[in-house]
């Protein structure tokens, strides 16, 4: 649970630990993480009146994108600090069976992500996710991040047209941010 400034829960403790640590190599990445986290946690949407209802879909996808950038930073620094149970990006997982079930019900999302050409590792993870073999939700966020940042993703192509569907994407972003907040706390124990 973030603090009122939308920074990680133990941000104040981080500031104090940063003054004392001998592991200065990790401080830069932890700082980057805290501000990426704050942006993702604080993000409430863009203002573009002429775009119309499509903007609400882009807003939830942007929140997932921002949460994933925070995730990238925390995984990197967690690995540097040798935090337990954090693997390299292609092997790291975030399990959430309830959210996985909700994501799998979005047929547009499934069709869109499975039709994209990704690296073979991500393709395999997505197939396993959508066939119910795994509840690792981070592969969905990673695929969304890729097509959002580098591809031809539109908000309607992944099923963001209803409030209920948009709430699932918000839940995906929030689950990633919760994971990040927990790993940040683990990192503090290693400083």
What residues fall within each predicted segment?
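Flexible secondary-structure boundary motifs
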Residues: 82-136
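Short, solvent-exposed loop/turn segments at secondary-structure junctions
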Residues: 76, 153-155
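Short acidic, glycine/Ser/Thr-rich loop/turn "cap" segments at secondary-structure junctions
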Residues: 51-55, 124-129, 156
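Intrinsic-disorder-associated interaction segments
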Residues: 1-7, 26, 92, 96, ...
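Extended intrinsically disordered or low-complexity regions, especially N/C-terminal cytosolic tails and loops
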Residues: 1-90
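Amphipathic, Lys/Arg-enriched alpha-helical patches that create a basic surface
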Residues: 135-148, 155-191
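Short, well-structured alpha-helical interface segments that form or flank functional binding sites
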Residues: 35, 58-69, 133-143, 167, ...
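Long, hydrophilic "mature protein body" segments
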Residues: 1-2, 124, 130, 143
């Amino acid at each position: 649970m973030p603090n009122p400034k939308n920074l990680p829960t133990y941000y104040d403790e981080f500031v104090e630990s940063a003054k004392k640590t001998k592991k200065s190599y990790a401080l830069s990445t932890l700082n980057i993480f805290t501000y990426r986290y704050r942006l993702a946690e604080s993000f409430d949407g863009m203002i573009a009146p002429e775009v119309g209802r499509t903007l609400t879909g882009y807003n939830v996808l942007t929140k997932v994108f921002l949460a994933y950038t925070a995730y990238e930073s925390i995984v990197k620094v967690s690995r540097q600090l040798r935090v337990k149970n954090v693997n390299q990006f292609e092997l790291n997982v975030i399990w959430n069976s309830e959210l996985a079930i909700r994501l799998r019900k979005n047929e547009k999302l499934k069709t869109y992500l499975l039709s994209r050409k990704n690296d073979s590792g991500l393709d395999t993870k997505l197939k396993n996710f959508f066939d119910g073999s795994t509840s690792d939700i981070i592969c969905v966020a990673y695929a969304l991040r890729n097509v959002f940042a580098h591809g031809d993703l539109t908000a309607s192509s992944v099923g963001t047209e209803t409030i209920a569907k948009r709430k699932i994407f918000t839940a995906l972003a929030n689950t990633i941010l919760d994971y990040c907040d927990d790993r940040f706390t683990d990192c503090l124990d290693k400083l």
